């Protein structure tokens, strides 16, 4: 005997006004099925489920400081991947500069008579560290509000209020809590945050 899911559950349409009826009950918001997504990448009012990398980055910057509505998991994670890729070159410059400073400091410390030519950090190491740090600061400031906004909208897609983002400020466990919330699948009830 095989299992028939349609027979196991009421496969008929719910009655008029039943909470599970799409478009009915709960004020006609349609919480009964899967979450409603954007039909076009240009529709910024709804999340774009299955967004490509390019679509997610465009939507990330077009919704620069929009804290209303929802963002899909693909939009959220591709936007964070983009920011991570932007930070690679400045982080490498910064790390090389710090490494050069550390090497010159260890050479100076290893010379007991102070006769080493490398008595301090070189100009190149200072320049690399400064350039890398400044670039990371500029990029970080440029994407601070968009990252906060997309995190806020991603929480909405999981039916969590946006201010739950501030749980990430709890030392030790806050980042893990927010990470778990961002991984959660979308919930139809999150449509209450749509504009």
Identify the role of each PLM range:
Residues 2-82, 148-164, 180-195:
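Membrane-interface extramembranous regions at the lipid-water interface
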Residues 4, 13, 40, 111, ...:
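Serine/threonine-rich low-complexity intrinsically disordered regions
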Residues 7, 20-23, 37, 106-124:
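Gly/Pro-rich, low-complexity intrinsically disordered segments
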Residues 44, 48, 53, 65, ...:
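Non-transmembrane, interaction-prone segments in cytosolic or luminal domains
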Residues 75-102, 125-151, 158-184:
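Hydrophobic alpha-helical transmembrane segments in multi-pass membrane proteins
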